[in-house]
């Protein structure tokens, strides 16, 4: 079961060992995949099915290293090509897989609590942003489909930066667009890569562990919310 990543009040996040009263929260920045929509399961399912088509197995443990980043040390497409070899139209095969993932994701709702936390942020006058290692077309497309695009003053994706999470660039760019210093901002993240990025940017961070990473060490986050 997916945890409600927005069940904690963003203003309640404390810097480890710090005092939030001295640094009031003025902005909240959401991750996207796994936080606003539960898209990770479709991605891993389509890749696992493709691996199985060629008699191979893609473990959840290995897949989990990709969650939250576009700069992982391995890529499923490259690994599959290397393992299976030539004689296949890999571009067409991968395009077919991607099209299936996109189609499966078109009916995904906003995760429980998203609308409520956005309403809370509006009521409190907080700046709201998205910082995602996914592409802009993917993120903005789903936000538009959900009727949420105009709820975000800053939308920063991998298309806007040179490095994705765990590098802090996505978050520093989002904060610059919001005009808020990192000590006055909270990130909400489901991945370890995302938590590392948020903390490196100088933000407080609420971690809602992705189900694939539920047993990982999220101690660097300021708050952890489990299902």
Residue spans for each PLM region:
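Asp-based, Mg2+/Mn2+-dependent phosphohydrolase catalytic module
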Residues: 2-26, 119-122, 135-227
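Short glycine-rich loop/turn motifs that provide flexible caps or phosphate-binding loops at active sites
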Residues: 33, 67, 128, 193, ...
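Conserved SAM-binding loop
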Residues: 36, 110, 128, 163, ...
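Residue-level detector of anion-binding/catalytic polar loops
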Residues: 57, 127, 204
């Amino acid at each position: 079961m997916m945890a409600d990543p927005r069940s904690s009040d963003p203003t309640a996040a404390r810097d480890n060992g710090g005092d939030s009263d001295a640094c009031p929260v003025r902005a909240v920045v959401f991750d996207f995949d796994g936080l606003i929509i539960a898209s990770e399961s479709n991605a891993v399912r389509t890749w696992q099915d493709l691996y199985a088509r060629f008699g191979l197995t893609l473990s959840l443990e290995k897949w989990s290293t990709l969650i939250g980043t576009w700069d992982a040390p391995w890529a499923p497409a490259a690994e599959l090509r290397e393992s299976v070899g030539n004689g296949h139209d890999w571009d067409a095969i991968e395009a077919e897989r991607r099209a299936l993932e996109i189609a499966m994701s078109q009916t995904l709702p906003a995760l429980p609590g998203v609308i409520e936390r956005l309403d809370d942020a509006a009521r409190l006058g907080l700046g709201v942003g998205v910082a995602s290692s996914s592409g802009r077309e993917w993120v903005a497309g789903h936000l538009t489909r959900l009727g949420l695009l105009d709820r975000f003053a800053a939308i920063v994706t991998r298309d806007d930066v040179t490095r994705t999470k765990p590098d802090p660039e996505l978050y520093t760019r989002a904060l610059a667009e919001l005009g808020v210093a990192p000590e006055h901002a909270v990130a909400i993240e489901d991945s370890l890569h995302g938590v590392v990025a948020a903390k490196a940017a100088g933000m407080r961070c609420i971690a809602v562990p992705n189900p694939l990473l539920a047993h990982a060490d999220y101690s660097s986050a300021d708050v952890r919310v489990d299902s």
